[in-house]
Amino acid sequence: MAHLRGFANQHSRVDPEELFTKLDRIGKGSFGEVYKGIDNRTKEVVAIKIIDLEEAEDEIEDIQQEITVLSQCDSPYITRYFGSYLKSTKLWIIMEYLGGGSALDLLKPGPLEETYIATILREILKGLDYLHSERKIHRDIKAANVLLSEQGDVKLADFGVAGQLTDTQIKRNTFVGTPFWMAPEVIKQSAYDFKADIWSLGITAIELAKGEPPNSDLHPMRVLFLIPKNSPPTLEGHHSKPFKEFVEACLNKDPRFRPTAKELLKHKFITRYTKKTSFLTELIDRYKRWRSEGHGEESSSEDSDIDGDPEDGEQGPIWTFPPTIRPSPHGKLHKGTALHGPQKSAEPVKRQPRSQCLSTLVRPVFGELKEKHKQSGGGVGALEELENAFSLAEESCPGISDKLMAHLVERVQRFSHSRNHLTSTR
C-alpha cells in the first residue's frame, strides 16, 4: 500500500461514486476497465477508467505517465481528461466519452475508401502536430489508439508510453511502442524524436487500407528483427498514387528525411481526398449495423471470459489495452502526480532503466513455449528456470535484458546478411 501514498491529493477523500454514475462497461484490458458514465453534477456523459492499483502495480508508472501527459494537453484532437479520484485501491480516471469506437473498430465490417482514410489521417496529423509542438511524442500510434466521437470527431488516445522531449533531451532512446508499428530507430534503441510517430502513422495508413499492419502474420519477436533489416513496407494494390506516395514519405528509414506532421497536412493525399469529419459518421453507422447483424460477437480477447461482456454492445469498446511495449517501472508513483485536473506545469516523468523486453517479449515467448511443451507432454521446469534467470539478472543489473536483446538483434541481422551474401555468390 505504500505506493498509494503518492496519490494523496484533494480528491483522495472524495467518493467518486457520489460524483459519477457507472453505466455499461465499454472496454477492458490487462489492468483496467472502462465504463460509460454520467457526471451527476452536470449530467454530462463521460468515460470512467477504473484501475485496481494493487493488481496493476507493474503498470503504475504507465498510469502516472498517461495522467501527466493528458493533464498537460489542451487540444480538440486529444482525448480530454477531467480528473482522477482514488477510492481505496481503485483509481478512477474520468475521460471524455467517445462513443464512435476506435478506427480499428471501423475497419471490422470491411475495407475503407480512400476518402475515409485520408480524413482520419488528417485528424491524426492534427493531433500529432499539436503534440510535437508541445515537445511530446505519442510513441504508440495505431488504429486502436484513435477514437471517434459519435459526431465523427477523431482524437488520439492511450498516452501510457508517451514521452516528453526537454531542451536538454532532444532525442530519446527508450524501447517502447507496439512491434508492428515501431520505427527502425526505436527498435535499434538509437536516439529518436517525434519522427518515430511519423513512421507509425505510415504503418497505420497501411493498416487502415488493408485491415492490418505489415507483417501481422509473423510473431512480434520476428518483426523486431525484420523492421530494421528489411526495406520499408509499401502500400500494395489498387490505391491512388497520392496515397502510395504519402505512405512512402512516412516510411523513410532515415528519420531525417521523413516529413513533419505539419508538412504532411499539406500533402496532396490529405488536401485532395479529405472531407469534413461528419462524413465519418457513415463509417460509425456501418459498424453499428454490422454489430447489430450479429457480427463480432465472439471476442478473441484474453479477457473475454467475463460473463455478459458489454464490449459487444452497440458502441463497441472505446478504450482498449492492446499489447504494447511499455517501460517497466522500477520506482512507484511520484508524490504530487496531477490527479485533480489539468496542470500545465507538470514535470515529465523520469523512468528507471528497467528492461521492457521482460514483459513484452521474454515472458510471452516463455509462456508460448511452456504451453507447447505441456501439450506435447513435456516438462516445463527447465524453461521456468531459464525465465527466472532473466528476472534475477534484471534485479541485480537493471536493463541487462534489453542490452542482451539488442545484441541478439544485431547478431541475427549480421548472420542473415552473411548467409544471404554467401547464397548470392554461389
Swiss-Prot record:
- List residues binding ATP: I26, G27, K28, G29, S30, F31, G32, E33, V34, K49
Residues found modified as Phosphoserine: S278
| Gene3D superfamilies reported for this sequence | 1.10.12.70, Phosphorylase Kinase, domain 1 (3.30.200.20), Transferase(Phosphotransferase) domain 1 (1.10.510.10)
Write out the ranges of the annotated region (Disordered): 292-355
One Pfam family linked to the record: PDCD10_N
Q: Summarize the activity regulation.
A: Interaction with Golgi matrix protein GOLGA2 leads to autophosphorylation on Thr-174, possibly as a consequence of stabilization of dimer formation. The C-terminal non-catalytic region inhibits the kinase activity.
Query: What's its EC?
Result: 2.7.11.1
Q: Which cofactor does it need?
A: Mg(2+)
Q: Which InterPro entries match?
A: Kinase-like_dom_sf (IPR011009), PDC10_dimerisation_sf (IPR046409), PDCD10_N (IPR048288), Prot_kinase_dom (IPR000719), Protein_kinase_ATP_BS (IPR017441), STE20/SPS1-PAK (IPR050629), STK_STK25 (IPR035060)
The top EC class is: transferase
Q: Which GO terms describe its biological process?
A: intracellular signal transduction
Print the keywords alphabetically.
ATP-binding, Cytoplasm, Golgi apparatus, Kinase, Magnesium, Metal-binding, Nucleotide-binding, Phosphoprotein, Serine/threonine-protein kinase, Transferase
Biased composition range(s): Acidic residues: 299-314
Write out the GO MF terms. Answer: ATP binding; metal ion binding; protein serine kinase activity; protein serine/threonine kinase activity
Instruction: Spell out which residues are annotated as carrying Phosphothreonine.
Output: T174
Q: Write down the chemical reaction(s) this protein catalyses.
A: L-seryl-[protein] + ATP = O-phospho-L-seryl-[protein] + ADP + H(+); L-threonyl-[protein] + ATP = O-phospho-L-threonyl-[protein] + ADP + H(+)
Q: Whom does it interact with, and what assembly results?
A: Homodimer. Interacts with CTTNBP2NL. Part of the core of STRIPAK complexes composed of PP2A catalytic and scaffolding subunits, the striatins (PP2A regulatory subunits), the striatin-associated proteins MOB4, STRIP1 and STRIP2, PDCD10 and members of the STE20 kinases, such as STK24 and STK26. Interacts with TAOK3 (via N-terminus); the interaction promotes STK25 abundance at the level of protein expression and/or stability.
Q: Which family does it belong to?
A: Belongs to the protein kinase superfamily. STE Ser/Thr protein kinase family. STE20 subfamily.
Would you tell me the protein name for this molecule? Serine/threonine-protein kinase 25
Q: Which organism is it from?
A: Bos taurus
The beginning of the lineage is: Eukaryota, Metazoa, Chordata, Craniata, Vertebrata
